[in-house]
Amino acid sequence: IPNQPPKEFEEGTEFYENYVTGGYFRSSGHDGFMREFVTIPKNRVVKYETIPSKVAAITEFVSVGIHGITRMKQVAHSRRNRIVVWGSGSLAYVVATLAKEKFPNSTIIVVGKNHDKLRLFSFADEVYDVSEIEDGFTFDHAFECVGGTGTQEAYRDIIKHIKPQGAVVMMGVSEFEVPLNTRDILEKGLTWVGSSRSGREDFEGAVQMMERPQVHS
């Protein structure tokens, strides 16, 4: 687990280790895993049994998706008929896969721009090119997985089409400040949550998910 919370961090509370002040992330502003000798506490290691090594290599990435799913479950109201994953990249693919598993009674929708990548989301219930969605298109909650220069456009479209009192989990990273239509956010009573990186519980959830043959195949 690359995330290292401070020694005084108390596990099992309402606070997440990946946001606590004083923590750090190995290989991002701190010495990481390319050193000749890597020394880490035992609680920074999560064991797996049957996951193929080439799949286990993306455990940290999957754990980020698990964390986003957890945040959504905490803040989203009980009407979860239609959940959208906005984006067509690798993060969107992981989050959509997890959402399909974690929200079995929901219609999982993917909206993106890249036609070739969108074809890979064959497991999703609905897949749309963002340029083709109609004014009547709606959903209850959203995962934003775009990031970069496309973040502003993604936020604008999500705000336009989401139903009132929906939750938006922001997962895409932009290096630039992104303006938001606060008037419509307030008018619709939307809940916005930032989700970044992950902790031990998320790694354990990722391993549990990836141990299943139908997932890692």
List each language-model region with its residue ranges.
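A general structural signal for well-ordered alpha-helical segments in protein cores
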Residues: G65, F139, Y155, F203-V207
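Short, intrinsically disordered, charge-balanced linker/junction segments flanking boundaries
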Residues: N3-P6, L120, P213-S217
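Glycine-rich cofactor phosphate-binding loops and adjacent beta1-alpha1 units
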Residues: Q74-R80, E101-S106, L118-T191
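C-terminal substrate-binding/catalytic core of Rossmann-like NAD(P)-dependent dehydrogenases/reductases
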Residues: S174-S217
